[in-house]
């Protein structure tokens, strides 16, 4: 559709909502559960909005997550009902508001204990026995807008994500009454709907849904055994137990298991909050230094050192101890599975489940298969990924799989540029300006230059950079964990002298540095490492943090939103 078609559709809905608002009788709407976006915009046309006093009852405007603002009069009716501050924050932040908070801001008028009390509450409202919310005047609108703008500017640019800036301007207008706000809202929504940014965000929404659907199904896995209690293995075990699996955690170092369990406890206390739930979840995470759980596990996930011979020894031993029909998975980040499978009598049992660090935060898991892998095992691993609340993407075994195959050439190109005299701070500022969560040079320091070097050897990337990294490693400068790399570090903070750089030069640098990432994604699609360009884009969006407003690297590069 074009802007005119979008506007015509909106006017039709607005007319319907206005008819509700104009009814001569008292109108009451009852909310039981989640009521977001257009549903809540309709609710705002009623005289009284009553909800259930339960965490499941939530209202809000999530449109900002699609690069939009409410389109059916929500920004105007929310302003009239709640006042500037509450309306602005609801529209700008896009987070669902729970019932008690909604009552305090005027987003709801009244709460009842349960569904059975709704009819009685409606009768009371119709009789005038419930006091309607009254909009609260903002003491200093300019200060509010300025504070919100500063927060937005610290995270993004209007060229990348115009919607939050448009919303701030929308609520800064001199004519702040409901009807004028709704009129401006319609125009803004229609413009934003056609913007490259919103099209990109909406594509990410669709990709997210597509990937999650791939993880829905019966996995027939109740018991997961994890070998390796380091950061990756320990966190994989913790997340598995948190999602209902019985987990045994094995490591030669008992102290490593203890540390992993304590990290899990802290995670559960943050996420679950309820002490009984924390205790119950910890009971599903069992220390198993001798690996007794192997005999009864439905799925093994190996997360030991990224050394082929070490992994092969682990799997050769595990195969002898595991029951027939159980799945064996490696968390390797780059080693071809065929190399590891050579140690097995039955290589069809081996698949890859490549999680990303930190496991409790990053959503992607690459499910890796070889020509020998049992398709049923691959499917079940996809479903386990979904049960872990991850976004599983199927990848054929190949060096680096998809994410590291795309990411590392981009990082190494940045290192090449630094070796050739480019300013590391300018590189990192340019890519953060584009929307990456971190610049490639700082990322190399964060990951560890030793890790980067070894991955570069596996993938055969840039001999020049590998030699440079090897010299830095021999000098003891391996990045954040040594206190010095391309930057000096103070704990988790890079000590960078931040300069001011020409915007056009940074844009050109960004395009140049992203070229190998895009090339590798395209090659991976051509070689059927992933099934489609959609899946390549999804992997980069959810695994690398490629900016959502682009819709993914291939989608962006194919023309939409690409700078000329």
Task: State what each model feature region is.
Residues 1-11, 23, 46, 50-51, ...:
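N-terminal glycine-rich phosphate-binding loop for ADP-containing cofactors
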Residues 10-17, 33:
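Generic internal hydrophobic packing segments that stabilize the cores of diverse globular domains
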Residues 16-29:
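Conserved catalytic cysteine-centered active-site region
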Residues 29-39:
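Gly/Ser-rich catalytic serine loop of serine hydrolases
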């Amino acid at each position: 559709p074009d802007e005119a078609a979008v506007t015509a559709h909106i006017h039709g809905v607005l007319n319907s909502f206005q008819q509700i608002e104009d009814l001569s009788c008292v109108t009451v709407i009852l909310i039981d559960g989640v009521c977001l976006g257009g549903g809540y915009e309709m609710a705002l046309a009623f005289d009284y909005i009553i909800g259930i006093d339960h965490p499941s009852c939530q209202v809000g405007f999530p449109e900002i997550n699609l690069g939009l603002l409410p389109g059916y009069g929500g920004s105007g009716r929310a302003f009239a009902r709640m006042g500037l501050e509450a309306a602005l924050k609801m529209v700008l932040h896009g987070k669902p508001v729970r019932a008690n908070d909604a009552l305090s801001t005027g987003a709801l008028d009244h709460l009842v204990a349960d569904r059975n009390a709704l009819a009685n509450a409606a009768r009371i409202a119709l009789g005038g026995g419930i006091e309607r919310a009254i909009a609260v005047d903002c003491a200093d609108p300019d200060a509010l807008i300025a504070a919100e703008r500063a927060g937005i500017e610290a995270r993004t640019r209007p060229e990348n994500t115009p919607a939050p800036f448009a919303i701030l301007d929308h609520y800064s207008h001199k004519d702040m009454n409901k009807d004028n706000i709704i009129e401006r809202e319609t125009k803004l929504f229609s413009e934003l709907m056609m913007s490259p940014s919103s099209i990109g965000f909406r594509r990410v929404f669709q990709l997210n849904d597509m990937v999650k659907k791939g993880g829905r199904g019966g996995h027939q896995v109740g018991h997961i055994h994890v070998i390796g209690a380091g950061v990756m293995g320990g966190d994989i075990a913790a997340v598995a137990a948190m999602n209902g699996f019985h987990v045994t955690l094995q490591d030669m170092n008992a102290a490593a298991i203890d540390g992993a369990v304590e990290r899990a406890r802290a995670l559960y206390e943050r996420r679950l909050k309820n002490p009984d739930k924390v205790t119950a979840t910890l009971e599903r995470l069992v220390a198993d230094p001798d690996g007794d759980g192997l005999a009864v596990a439905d799925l093994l996930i190996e997360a030991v050192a990224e050394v082929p011979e070490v992994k092969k020894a682990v799997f050769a031993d595990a195969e002898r101890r595991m029951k027939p029909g159980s799945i064996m998975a490696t968390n390797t980040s780059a080693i071809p599975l065929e190399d590891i499978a050579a140690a097995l009598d039955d290589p069809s049992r081996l698949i890859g489940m490549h999680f990303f660090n930190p496991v409790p935060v990053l959503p992607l898991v690459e499910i890796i298969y070889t020509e020998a892998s049992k398709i049923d095992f691959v499917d079940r691993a996809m479903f386990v990924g979904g049960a872990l609340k991850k976004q599983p993407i199927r990848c054929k075994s190949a060096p680096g799989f998809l994410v590291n195959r795309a990411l590392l050439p981009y990082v190494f190109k940045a290192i090449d540029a630094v070796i050739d005299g480019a300013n590391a701070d300018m590189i990192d500022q340019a890519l953060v300006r584009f929307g990456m969560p971190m610049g490639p040079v700082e990322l190399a320091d964060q990951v560890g230059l030793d890790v980067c070097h070894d991955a570069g050897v596996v993938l055969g990337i840039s001999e020049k950079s590998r030699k440079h990294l090897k010299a830095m490693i021999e000098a003891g400068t391996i990045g954040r964990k040594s206190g010095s790399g391309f930057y000096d570090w103070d704990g988790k903070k890079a000590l960078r002298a931040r300069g001011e750089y020409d915007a056009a030069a940074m844009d050109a640098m960004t395009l140049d540095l992203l070229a190998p990432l895009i090339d590798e994604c395209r090659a991976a699609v051509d070689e059927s490492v992933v099934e489609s360009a959609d899946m390549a884009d999804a992997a980069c969006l959810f695994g690398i943090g490629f900016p959502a407003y682009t819709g993914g690297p291939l989608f962006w590069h194919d023309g939409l939103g690409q700078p000329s």
